[in-house]
UniProtKB/Swiss-Prot annotation:
Residues 1-202 are annotated as: Disordered. Dopamine- and cyclic AMP-regulated neuronal phosphoprotein. This is Protein phosphatase 1 regulatory subunit 1B. The modification Phosphothreonine is found at T34, T75. One of its GO terms (molecular function) is molecular function inhibitor activity. The keyword Metal-binding does not apply. Belongs to the protein phosphatase inhibitor 1 family. Inhibitor of protein-phosphatase 1. The gene is PPP1R1B. Keywords: Acetylation, Cytoplasm, Phosphoprotein, Protein phosphatase inhibitor. Its main location: cytoplasm. Residues 41-63, 109-118, 191-202 have a biased composition (Basic and acidic residues). It holds the Pfam family DARPP-32. GO terms for cellular component: axon cytoplasm; cytoplasm; dendrite cytoplasm; neuronal cell body.
Length: 202
């Protein structure tokens, strides 16, 4: 039942305008122009007629207005304008760099006046580190030169410490110890052979 009622409503809608007076029909047509009328107006009308109130009310005059050049539309800058922008940007960057460099120099001058030479302190720290590395290299050379001798060096970070003997020393000592221990190794080797003889007898 509902779909039939809807169809009846749809067919009954266009009927009333035929009962209106021809004057009212003309007024309605003027207020609501058809697309064909709008097309004709757009071809032959002047800008003043395009902005007429009845087209504003209809809302279709927007299509006509959109054909005009919109003052708010984005227009890309020309090559000359782009070059000017780039040059001004580069100049501002160079000015900023110069200002920063001059500010740093001023700060360094003030710090030197106050007695805080930063650069000199950094150089001294680097020299101290190089001296420590040189002293460590000398210690390693000295330990290699004294083969097998335990040498004590100056205090380290945690206190006095002894460097273990280098690898060259124990090999020499170990070779002599192995020669001394060889007969001792042979003796225990002979001991298991002695009980091995009575086992087959038992």
């Amino acid at each position: 039942m509902d779909p039939k009622d809807r169809k009846k409503i749809q067919f009954s809608v266009p009927a009333p305008p035929s009962q209106l007076d021809p004057r009212q029909v003309e007024m309605i047509r003027r207020r609501r122009p058809t697309p064909a009328m709008l097309f004709r107006l757009s071809e032959h009308s002047s800008p003043e007629e395009e902005a007429s109130p009845h087209q504003r009310a209809s809302g279709e005059g927007h299509h006509l207005k959109s054909k005009r050049s919109n003052p708010c539309a984005y227009t890309p800058p020309s090559l000359k304008a782009v070059q000017r922008i780039a040059e001004s940007h580069l100049q501002s960057i160079s000015n900023l760099g110069e200002n920063q460099a001059s500010e740093e120099e001023d700060e360094l001058g003030e710090l030197r006046e106050l007695g805080y030479p930063r650069e000199e302190e950094e150089e001294e720290e680097e020299e101290d580190e190089e001296e420590e590395e040189d002293s460590q290299a000398e210690v390693l050379k000295g330990s290699r030169g004294s083969a097998g001798q335990k040498t004590t060096y100056g205090q380290g970070l945690e206190g006095p410490w002894e460097r273990p003997p280098p690898l060259d020393g124990p090999q020499r000592d170990g070779s002599s110890e192995d020669q001394v221990e060889d007969p001792a190794l042979n003796e225990p080797g002979e001991e298991p052979q002695r009980p091995a003889h009575p086992e087959p007898g038992t």
